[in-house]
């Protein structure tokens, strides 16, 4: 795993992981990921709408983000959902998040995935942390690409605007093409 120190005091910061974490998540119930549980969170990249973590310093009016640029093409099953797990095959999923390292806000990311201090199974369900390991044959390599970006923002809203626009431009989301109608999907999900 890799860590990038922002140099910002952790207590002066707000945090963002698209679709998962906004500010300090203090309005979330205690069963959901929030500062009520921990001030450091690492999650699988597929838990997020974009594989990105951002830290905004309200005092410095600056932010630092890390995002993954690789294609996510595979995942592998495990026999366990907590503790140290060995993957059954290849995965392209890593992790991203933020940590309080001796009072300094730090971006953390790596491969394969880790979730700490808890794993987020589904809405309002936290489980013990997990750390995955993938077998590599001698001489085999895995090339991964993350981008660390730093800039200024007038406030947290400006930081979110900038980051959202960056994610939209970078990942260019498109509607999902499905052979099923909305009515068929609703019928299947409700039965």
What is each residue range found by the language model?
Residues 53-55, 107-112, 142-148, 163, ...:
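Long, contiguous hydrophobic alpha-helical segments, chiefly transmembrane helices and signal peptides
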Residues 1-138:
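Beta-strand/loop-rich accessory regions of lumenal/periplasmic or secreted enzymes
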Residues 154-191:
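Low-complexity, Ser/Thr/Pro/Gly-enriched N-terminal "stalk/linker" regions
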């Amino acid at each position: 795993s890799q860590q990038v120190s922002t140099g910002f005091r952790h207590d002066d910061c707000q945090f963002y992981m698209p679709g998962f974490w906004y500010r300090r998540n203090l309005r979330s119930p205690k069963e959901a990921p929030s500062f009520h549980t921990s001030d450091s969170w690492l999650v699988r990249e597929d838990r997020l709408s974009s594989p990105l973590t951002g830290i905004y310093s309200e005092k410095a009016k600056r932010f630092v983000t890390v995002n993954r640029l690789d294609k996510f093409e595979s995942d592998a099953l495990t026999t366990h959902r907590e503790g140290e797990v060995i993957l059954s095959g290849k995965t392209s999923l890593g992790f991203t998040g933020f940590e309080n390292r001796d009072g300094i806000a730090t971006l953390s990311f790596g491969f394969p995935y880790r979730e700490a201090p808890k794993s987020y199974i589904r809405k309002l369900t936290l489980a013990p942390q997990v750390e995955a390991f993938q077998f590599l044959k001698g001489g085999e390599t895995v090339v991964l690409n993350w981008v660390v970006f730093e800039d200024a923002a007038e406030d947290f809203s400006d930081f979110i605007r900038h980051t959202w626009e960056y994610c939209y431009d970078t990942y260019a989301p498109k509607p999902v093409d499905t052979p099923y109608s909305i009515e068929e999907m609703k019928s299947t999900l409700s039965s």
